[in-house]
Amino acid sequence: MKYLKLLLLLLTVSSYSQYKDGISVVQFSAEFVQENEISLKKFNDHNTHLFYLSKHSDHFTNEKIIYIPTVILFHDGEEILKIESGVTLNLPEDTTARIEKAIDKILS
């Protein structure tokens, strides 16, 4: 029983950190604002993740997500860029460009 608890803890920790590995573009959202999300297809050369509040509330808490949608760029576990929608529930128009610029800076 003790080993089972340890295994579950390790799996939880590893799945939590996996979405931050390498260069990762992570979008935090909810089903009712799907139309306000950005497409992550442009970033398919990197790790991309889309988390919904109804399914991954623990990630929202851990990353201190206040507004949805929010996009965070991670590099090897470190938060590089965080773009929030604010009370409008709309991400800024230059969100994709800002992410691309930050990725280019990481790669240079």
Feature annotation, model-predicted:
Residues 1-9:
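Sec-dependent signal peptide recognition
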Residues 59-62, 83:
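Short, charged, surface-exposed secondary-structure boundary motifs
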Residues 73-108:
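Non-catalytic, surface beta->alpha helical segment in thiol-disulfide oxidoreductase systems
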Residues 31-34, 58, 79-80, 89:
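Solvent-exposed loop/turn segments at secondary-structure junctions
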Residues 63-75:
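Structural micro-motif
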Residues 18-49:
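Local sequence-structure signature of Cys/Sec-based thiol-disulfide redox active-site neighborhoods
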Residues 8-17:
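Hydrophobic h-region of N-terminal signal peptides that target proteins for export
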Residues 53-59:
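N-terminal post-signal-peptidase region of extra-cytosolic proteins
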